[in-house]
Amino acid sequence: MADTEVEMQVSAADTNNNENGQAQSNYEYDVNVQDEEDEAAAGPMPLQMLEGNGITASDIKKIHEAGYYTVESIAYTPKRQLLLIKGISEAKADKLLGEASKLVPMGFTTATEYHIRRSELITITTGSKQLDTLLQGGVETGSITELFGEFRTGKSQICHTLAVTCQLPIDMGGGEGKCLYIDTEGTFRPVRLLAVADRYGLNGEEVLDNVAYARAYNADHQLELLQQAANMMSESRFSLLVVDSCTALYRTDFSGRGELSARQMHLARFMRTLQRLADEFGIAVVITNQVVAQVDGISFNPDPKKPIGGNILAHSSTTRLSLRKGRGEQRICKIYDSPCLPESEAIFAINSDGVGDPKEIIAPV
């Protein structure tokens, strides 16, 4: 009789353990599913989500071949651009825009909700604490940051450092994503990435594998590379796009006042595409810009150099940073234009392991 009672108690305990184990398993499954759903909701939506309600797989293939890879890209595109796609009628374009607008929020929201979204934005560390403080956390994702200055002011060095720090975990000031690097001047050096990777304890080979590099040879090619970039970003997680330099090829491909209008129109299209990528994929876009001397007949001009690109570039960039040389390896960064950052300066240094803080600040002579 006693043995029977013991067996019944053991059996009941086993049943409870099985139920608890099953409940734990179900809980872990639910958490994993929720994490996957949250991750999917946070990223861009694939075109396949538009299929149905009169939109066929053939239509999806047509717009994909035309260079549209996400639902967001359809929602942000004017109707007349969709009509240029072969095989897309006006009725079909209306259908595409209607279905995309249901999935992508494009209406009004309260300032409170927008403030909450802004507070959740990821910033990517520059490698310098002083520079990060100036930028209130680092380079902002979802917007365009422009670096301009004369030669040897640290523009390319900041880009090289960011190409590594964007791969860091978010709690270390990174973006947990790959980098896409467009080089127009032939100044990209992978050995600099290895030095920065070693500084942060990252595997050098993995860091280089996570940087997609392309050399642009003319202004048209530079714009075409953004089309390839959109395709790559739709397939993998990128957190940074670098264009170094954004304007170098425009200065040589378009010469004289006779081509000024064509140059500015082409540059405006390029900058608009950059902003679309930032909006669509939530990446940080960093561009470098050159400067030109001002010859205006004024005998005294405290700042004789200005960034090129005119009003097109000035209005397209969200944050503009002016860089100038300091003493030794020190460089000075000034907020030139920003919708939210105060006009102030910070001193950083170019070290053997990338951009960092100066060991001691040397006052200029």
Curated annotation (Swiss-Prot):
**Which top-rank group of organisms is this from?**
Eukaryota
Record-linked Pfam families: HHH_5, Rad51
Q: Which GO terms describe its cellular component?
A: chromatin; chromosome, centromeric region; condensed nuclear chromosome; nuclear envelope; nucleus; site of double-strand break
Q: Does the keyword Plastid apply?
A: no
Region Disordered: list its residue ranges: 1-25
UniProt cross-references to InterPro entries, sorted A to Z = AAA+_ATPase (IPR003593), DNA_recomb/repair_Rad51 (IPR011941), DNA_recomb/repair_Rad51_C (IPR013632), DNA_recomb/repair_RecA-like (IPR016467), DNA_repair_Rad51/TF_NusA_a-hlx (IPR010995), P-loop_NTPase (IPR027417), RecA_ATP-bd (IPR020588), RecA_monomer-monomer_interface (IPR020587)
Biological process (GO), any one = double-strand break repair involved in meiotic recombination
Question: Which terms in the Gene Ontology molecular function aspect does this entry carry?
Answer: ATP binding; ATP hydrolysis activity; ATP-dependent activity, acting on DNA; ATP-dependent DNA damage sensor activity; DNA strand exchange activity; double-stranded DNA binding; identical protein binding; single-stranded DNA binding
Q: PROSITE patterns in the record, alphabetically?
A: RECA_2, RECA_3
Where does the record place it? Nucleus
Checking PANTHER family in the record gives: DNA REPAIR PROTEIN RAD51 HOMOLOG 1, RECA/RAD51/RADA DNA STRAND-PAIRING FAMILY MEMBER
Q: Which family does this protein fall into?
A: Belongs to the RecA family. RAD51 subfamily.
Subunit info here reads: Interacts with rad22, rad54, rdh54, rhp54, rti1, swi2 and swi5. Forms homooiligomers.
- What is the protein's known function? Required both for recombination and for the repair of DNA damage caused by X-rays. Binds to single and double-stranded DNA, in the presence of magnesium, and exhibits DNA-dependent ATPase activity. Promotes DNA strand annealing and strand exchange via DNA recombinase activity and forms helical nucleoprotein filaments.
This protein is called DNA repair protein rhp51
Gene this chain is encoded by: rhp51
